Amino acid sequence: MDIISLGWAGLMTMFTFSLALVVWARNGF
């Protein structure tokens, strides 16, 4: 696994996590 694919995996994980936090915040947890 090279550094670029690893970076993309981390970026997608952070994006999905932040998106889930926004949805949870809108629903009032």
From Swiss-Prot:
Cited Pfam families:
PetN
GO cellular component terms given for this protein: chloroplast thylakoid membrane; cytochrome b6f complex
UniProt-listed SUPFAM superfamilies: PetN subunit of the cytochrome b6f complex
- Where is this chain primarily localised? plastid
The subcellular localization recorded is:
Plastid, Chloroplast thylakoid membrane
Q: Does the keyword Amino-acid biosynthesis apply?
A: no
Q: How does it sit in the membrane?
A: Single-pass membrane protein
Entry keywords, A to Z: Chloroplast, Electron transport, Membrane, Photosynthesis, Plastid, Thylakoid, Transmembrane, Transmembrane helix, Transport
Which GO molecular-function terms appear in the entry? Answer: electron transporter, transferring electrons within cytochrome b6/f complex of photosystem II activity
Source species, domain of life? Eukaryota
What is an annotated GO biological process for this record, any one? photosynthesis
Q: Where are the transmembrane segments?
A: 3-23
Q: Does the keyword Ligase apply?
A: no
Q: What does this chain do?
A: Component of the cytochrome b6-f complex, which mediates electron transfer between photosystem II (PSII) and photosystem I (PSI), cyclic electron flow around PSI, and state transitions.
Q: Which family does it belong to?
A: Belongs to the PetN family.
Q: How does it assemble?
A: The 4 large subunits of the cytochrome b6-f complex are cytochrome b6, subunit IV (17 kDa polypeptide, PetD), cytochrome f and the Rieske protein, while the 4 small subunits are PetG, PetL, PetM and PetN. The complex functions as a dimer.
The protein depicted here goes by the name: Cytochrome b6-f complex subunit 8
Organism of origin: Trieres chinensis
